[in-house]
């Protein structure tokens, strides 16, 4: 039997086993009514779709059996998934964990306070909420200790970008740069781009629902001079290696044609890495 089929069968079997043993998790807020079950399934589907589209392909993802099944259904490769067993004492070994109600119950507040402080996205509300969390190297304490210095570095890089005569920034983009709210990968790429041509920074954003306030904005819309300028921006991004955006294309907005670009999550906080 093919390896993919074996993995799928394993997920299915362990998912059934997890359901049979759910009573062991006395605090597990498992949905019991048809409406709650439907809501839980919808939250899993939305979270899985977001991960398939927004999370770096190189990242290992921790998930409970049902969530792992939903991720596979969204075409996330089984090789990217690490199933978290009900007996696991901690979520270590993965870079991103899908904090379903079952896993929040299993690890309690330690999930956020010890291991995974950063919320990349969130789906649903109340007890059925699903958070996509980043497991910080060194744990939450180390992560939180680095936040201030990382923001200062992003502010400095933003100031440097704004000082470039080739950069024209909207009020929103200007404010985001000076507040240190822009992803380092965007700062580096836009700095390189501005050395070659004039660019207009329209907006920085992150389309992720429920994203944490400490997560830098990893998307941008960029204007240029005429269609030739936009083509030059696209050509520049295509040629990038280390910092090529995960998604970029030319689109039309109310003010005209722009290039939209976005990096996948999770991204670095500081200019020299995590």
Task: Give the location of each predicted region.
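Aromatic/acidic, Gly/Pro-rich catalytic loop(s) in extracytoplasmic/lumenal soluble domains
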Residues: 94-274
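Catalytic lumenal/periplasmic loop and adjoining terminal transmembrane helix
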Residues: 28-117, 190-196, 208-211, 227, ...
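C-terminal region of N-terminal signal peptides and the immediate post-cleavage residues
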Residues: 4-33
């Amino acid at each position: 039997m093919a390896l993919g089929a074996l993995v799928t069968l394993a997920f299915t079997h362990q998912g059934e086993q997890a359901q049979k043993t759910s009573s062991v998790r006395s605090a597990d807020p498992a949905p019991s009514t048809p409406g709650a079950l439907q809501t839980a399934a919808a939250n899993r589907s939305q979270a899985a779709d977001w991960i398939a589209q927004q999370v770096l392909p190189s990242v290992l993802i921790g998930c409970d059996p049902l969530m792992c099944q939903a991720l596979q259904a969204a075409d996330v490769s089984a090789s990217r998934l690490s199933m978290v067993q009900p007996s696991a004492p901690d979520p270590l070994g993965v870079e991103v964990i899908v904090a379903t109600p079952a896993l929040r119950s299993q690890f309690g507040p330690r999930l956020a306070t010890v291991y995974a402080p950063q919320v990349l996205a969130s789906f649903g509300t109340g007890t059925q909420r699903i958070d996509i969390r980043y497991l910080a190297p060194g744990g939450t304490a180390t992560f939180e200790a680095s936040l201030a210095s990382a923001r200062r570095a992003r502010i400095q890089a933003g100031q440097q970008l704004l000082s470039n005569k080739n950069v024209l920034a909207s009020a929103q983009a200007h404010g985001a740069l000076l507040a240190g709210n822009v992803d380092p990968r965007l700062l580096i790429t836009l700095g390189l781009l501005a050395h070659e041509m004039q660019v207009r920074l329209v907006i920085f954003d992150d389309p992720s629902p429920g994203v944490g306030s400490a997560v830098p904005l990893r998307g941008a819309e960029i204007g240029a001079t005429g269609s030739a300028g936009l083509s030059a921006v696209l050509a520049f991004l295509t040629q990038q290696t280390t910092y090529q955006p995960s998604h970029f294309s030319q689109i039309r907005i109310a003010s005209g044609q722009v290039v939209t670009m976005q990096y996948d999550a999770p991204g670095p906080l500081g200019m020299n890495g995590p």
